[in-house]
Amino acid sequence: MKILIADDSSTVRRLVAARLSADGYQVLEAADGAEAVELARSGRPDLLVLDKVMPKMDGFEVVRALREDPRTASVPIVMLTERTSEQDVLGGLGLGVEEYMPKPFSPLELSLRVRRLLARAAP
């Protein structure tokens, strides 16, 4: 299974990629929102791990773009971000984000959430 990690922090991308690669997933990485949309459309990931605050397009703009595209509309999304106000969480969930996790985060918790979402999405 393929997972796209979109975060402008290379440190966070490396940490998440290391955990998910150790779990056996193929990992794609994007450093900004526009690249995330492009890779989601071309790379066809099974799940996205997405930051909210990124250059070019923020995480909510990415979610909107992906949900409007039939090729990516049903891809599960985990929002992994420092933006955890009630307004941010409700905004993300309202756009169709399946999970909203705060930073700092537990890589093991992220791994379990990813596994659970992928199991639910499997045919």
Model-assigned labels for residue ranges:
Residues 54:
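Receiver (REC) domain active-site loop signature in two-component systems and cognate sites
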Residues 105-115:
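C-terminal output helix
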Residues 24-31, 39:
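Short hydrophobic/Thr-rich beta-strand motif most characteristic of the beta2 strand and flanking loop
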Residues 14-22:
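Charged docking surfaces used in two-component/phosphorelay signaling
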Residues 43-49:
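Active-site beta3 strand of CheY-like receiver
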